[in-house]
């Protein structure tokens, strides 16, 4: 089964927790702090595997959660970083964040990698919090939560040339006679329901990959007739070969077919019109084909170069292949996506107080609910079993401006404040 789009969940490993520990040393309060830092959580890394051809495996496994880092230990020993979770994908896979629509990676070459969900850093042990006024702190951090997201995987076939046109115009037959590909061919519409690839050799030491794409119909750009699934595979091609049935046996007008297909390409992705297009008048061995071709030429004008062929008899096919090979030599690749830059520019352990974003809402029972990435991360990294950690969290909330914002919303002593699933009292 050919699967070219799936939604999956990925989560980087949480960082390991820092440790509160002390060493035994004479004249040093409590022996001095000796708690180690937690190890970094594992990343979720996508790797291109050239042997894969479809996203079928993701139909059965849709959750990928990397391991957390090892916790810090006594004697100042830091936890070990966990090994990254490797997820293999086929060449041509585009990874998109479902929530934002951002393109996270465009994976095309064997061995190419991309970090899709970063692991969290390890929490600091108590030795990191020692100061002149507090030489033996009873405080350590929990590990930072790993990044988590839902992502859409789209497979867009890697081909130099894409065959487009209405169903049953002869695309599959053409591919079968110019390459060793053996697509399914029959006298009914939508025989081809998945892309078929074939390597074409021109006879003068040139070759290229051609894709027979499923037939398009009017409204394909809006998803009619599985149009989105079909059209996405054209995006990587450098040359479009537009196959038109000149026989008239289907009762359609060749010129109307030509206009309709080009409109669908334009509506789906305007950049598809930048690619050179070779117009192929197929089925020229049929009785009315010559007359239909003349009428077609009158409507499109002299600017459109047309290659009359018969895929069945191979008439005109050689000239067509040479034209396509010539175009490929002068046509650059078209980048189909601008990949988002998610490089980590944060400074470890530095609390940024400017621009901290959070939301405060109020439930029907009067509970204040605080949400936002920074406060939720800080909350998760706090060890609430230790009083010093609780006091530090209170200072961090004040530093973020949350206390002041709660007062502005009318919060008073004893009001309930909620972060994630935890509730506590507001003390002014």
Curated annotation (Swiss-Prot):
<comment type="function">
    <text>An essential GTPase which binds GTP, GDP and possibly (p)ppGpp with moderate affinity, with high nucleotide exchange rates and a fairly low GTP hydrolysis rate. Plays a role in control of the cell cycle, stress response, ribosome biogenesis and in those bacteria that undergo differentiation, in morphogenesis control.</text>
</comment>
<dbReference type="GO" id="GO:0003924">
    <property type="term" value="F:GTPase activity"/>
</dbReference>
<dbReference type="InterPro" id="IPR027417">
    <property type="entry name" value="P-loop_NTPase"/>
</dbReference>
<protein>
    <recommendedName>
        <fullName>GTPase Obg</fullName>
        <ecNumber>3.6.5.-</ecNumber>
    </recommendedName>
</protein>
<dbReference type="InterPro" id="IPR036726">
    <property type="entry name" value="GTP1_OBG_dom_sf"/>
</dbReference>
<dbReference type="InterPro" id="IPR006074">
    <property type="entry name" value="GTP1-OBG_CS"/>
</dbReference>
<dbReference type="InterPro" id="IPR031167">
    <property type="entry name" value="G_OBG"/>
</dbReference>
<feature type="binding site">
    <location>
        <begin position="190"/>
        <end position="194"/>
    </location>
    <ligand>
        <name>GTP</name>
    </ligand>
</feature>
<dbReference type="Pfam" id="PF01926">
    <property type="entry name" value="MMR_HSR1"/>
</dbReference>
<dbReference type="InterPro" id="IPR036346">
    <property type="entry name" value="GTP-bd_prot_GTP1/OBG_C_sf"/>
</dbReference>
<feature type="binding site">
    <location>
        <position position="192"/>
    </location>
    <ligand>
        <name>Mg(2+)</name>
    </ligand>
</feature>
<comment type="subunit">
    <text>Monomer.</text>
</comment>
<feature type="binding site">
    <location>
        <begin position="212"/>
        <end position="215"/>
    </location>
    <ligand>
        <name>GTP</name>
    </ligand>
</feature>
<dbReference type="GO" id="GO:0000287">
    <property type="term" value="F:magnesium ion binding"/>
</dbReference>
<keyword id="KW-0378">Hydrolase</keyword>
<dbReference type="InterPro" id="IPR005225">
    <property type="entry name" value="Small_GTP-bd"/>
</dbReference>
<dbReference type="InterPro" id="IPR045086">
    <property type="entry name" value="OBG_GTPase"/>
</dbReference>
<dbReference type="Pfam" id="PF01018">
    <property type="entry name" value="GTP1_OBG"/>
</dbReference>
<feature type="binding site">
    <location>
        <begin position="282"/>
        <end position="285"/>
    </location>
    <ligand>
        <name>GTP</name>
    </ligand>
</feature>
<keyword id="KW-0963">Cytoplasm</keyword>
<dbReference type="GO" id="GO:0005737">
    <property type="term" value="C:cytoplasm"/>
</dbReference>
<keyword id="KW-0460">Magnesium</keyword>
<dbReference type="InterPro" id="IPR015349">
    <property type="entry name" value="OCT_dom"/>
</dbReference>
<feature type="binding site">
    <location>
        <position position="172"/>
    </location>
    <ligand>
        <name>Mg(2+)</name>
    </ligand>
</feature>
<dbReference type="GO" id="GO:0005525">
    <property type="term" value="F:GTP binding"/>
</dbReference>
<comment type="similarity">
    <text>Belongs to the TRAFAC class OBG-HflX-like GTPase superfamily. OBG GTPase family.</text>
</comment>
<dbReference type="InterPro" id="IPR014100">
    <property type="entry name" value="GTP-bd_Obg/CgtA"/>
</dbReference>
<dbReference type="InterPro" id="IPR006073">
    <property type="entry name" value="GTP-bd"/>
</dbReference>
<feature type="domain" description="OCT">
    <location>
        <begin position="350"/>
        <end position="428"/>
    </location>
</feature>
<dbReference type="GO" id="GO:0042254">
    <property type="term" value="P:ribosome biogenesis"/>
</dbReference>
<keyword id="KW-0342">GTP-binding</keyword>
<feature type="domain" description="OBG-type G">
    <location>
        <begin position="159"/>
        <end position="329"/>
    </location>
</feature>
<dbReference type="Pfam" id="PF09269">
    <property type="entry name" value="DUF1967"/>
</dbReference>
<feature type="domain" description="Obg">
    <location>
        <begin position="1"/>
        <end position="158"/>
    </location>
</feature>
<feature type="binding site">
    <location>
        <begin position="310"/>
        <end position="312"/>
    </location>
    <ligand>
        <name>GTP</name>
    </ligand>
</feature>
<feature type="binding site">
    <location>
        <begin position="165"/>
        <end position="172"/>
    </location>
    <ligand>
        <name>GTP</name>
    </ligand>
</feature>
<keyword id="KW-0547">Nucleotide-binding</keyword>
<dbReference type="InterPro" id="IPR006169">
    <property type="entry name" value="GTP1_OBG_dom"/>
</dbReference>
<keyword id="KW-0479">Metal-binding</keyword>
